[in-house]
Amino acid sequence: LLVVLVMVVILLLGRERSSIYRDESETKALIHQTGQNLVEIQTFDTAKQPRSIYLTEIPSRVFVSEGSILESLLALGQGDRIVAASISGASSGAYERIRQEYPEELEKVPHIAPQGMNREQAVAYAPDFIMGWQSAFTLSRFGTVSWWQERGVNTYIAATSNHVLKYGTIE
């Protein structure tokens, strides 16, 4: 559900790309300079520490790691923004269920890997936003959140993944 809320916020921006602004002073300077509205999204880093990202535009090249996140985006009609999806555990039948429930949206996704991808494969898709579970942002998978941030790519770690938050409240 949190992923759905994040995507709704992104949709409300009405732009085509995302931007990273690392601190409050830089964010205020950008608002003053451009007059653009920013949307703050609270997420986590690789070490499960809270962090914020600020979006000025809708991500247009989203890389998705995990079937549940893919399903949420497809349910919101965002298949055309997804450049690739890495679905681990595809043998569980989750992919088949997604394929049957959202066939038109799934057709818009250029590449879906039934096995996990690595960082080099993710880089090849030139994403501007990566959504996944905390376990995807390790050196052995896609690399750390800071690695992507240094390259101008926003990341979103679902709070419900890999015990990032023990308990949560949706407001």
For each of these PLM feature ranges, what is it?
Residues L1-S72:
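Bacterial Sec-exported substrate-binding components of ABC uptake systems
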Residues R17-I20, P110, M117, N162, ...:
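Structured C-terminal subdomain patch of bacterial secreted/periplasmic proteins
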Residues Q33, Y54-I58, G77, V123-A124, ...:
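Extracellular/periplasmic catalytic domains that process cell-envelope and extracellular macromolecules
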Residues L38, K108-V109, T155:
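Predominantly a core beta-strand signature of beta-propeller blades
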Residues V64-Y125, F129-F137:
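A short, structured surface patch at a secondary-structure boundary
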Residues F129, S140-E171:
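Extracytoplasmic substrate-binding proteins
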